[in-house]
């Protein structure tokens, strides 16, 4: 991730993040604060710029997140919808024990209390996500394997399966349909 990239650039091993929170809370706060110069803020800015570029080019994208902030997801869905995108959600669920175990084996280990609170928030949000995405929402369980490589492969398989299915389906968003129609008219007018 961009956050991990900037941590490494600052000379910090992402695996040490949980340790830093416990042993050097001031540094942890400095790294993760909303200060525009913080590692977290710079990473968020880069992510936002990349997303903007994709949206300007009307390119498809997969947005990966924890889902602990339902308002953020709802806002992203609304913004994308206004740009003509059809939006879908693959909700990859796991047990808390598995989430904690996987976290301990990640390159960037988060403090256990953050993982636990985030997991609880996500579980509370499942129903709301179903309301927001309606028929464009699917839940898959990825709790049965702890090995990070296997879990990542399974996750990728799930996402690819649904992303391929949805990408091949006709555009439903009226603004998206209009944009495609205009692009085809431009293409035809240019004789291509």
Task: Label the model's feature ranges.
Residues 1-3, 92-94, 141-143:
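Short loop/turn segments at strand-loop or loop-helix junctions that form parts
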Residues 42-56, 70-75, 112-131:
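PAPS-dependent sulfotransferase catalytic domain
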């Amino acid at each position: 991730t961009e956050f991990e990239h900037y941590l490494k650039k600052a000379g910090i091993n992402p695996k040490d993040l949980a340790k830093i929170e416990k042993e050097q809370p001031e540094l942890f706060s400095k790294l993760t604060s909303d200060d525009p110069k913080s590692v977290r803020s710079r990473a968020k800015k880069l992510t936002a710029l990349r997303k903007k570029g994709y949206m300007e080019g009307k390119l498809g994208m997969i947005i990966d997140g924890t889902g602990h902030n339902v308002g953020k997801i709802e806002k992203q869905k609304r913004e994308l919808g206004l740009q003509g995108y059809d939006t879908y959600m693959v909700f990859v669920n796991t047990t808390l024990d598995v989430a904690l175990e996987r976290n301990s084996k990640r390159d960037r280990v988060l403090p256990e209390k953050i993982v636990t609170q985030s997991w609880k928030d996500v579980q509370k949000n499942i129903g709301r996500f179903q309301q927001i995405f309606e028929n464009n929402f699917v839940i898959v369980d990825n709790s049965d394997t702890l090995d990070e490589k296997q879990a990542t492969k399974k996750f990728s398989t799930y996402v690819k399966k649904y992303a391929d299915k949805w990408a091949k389906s006709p555009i439903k968003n009226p603004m998206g349909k209009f944009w495609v129609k205009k692009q085809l008219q431009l293409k035809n007018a240019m004789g291509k």
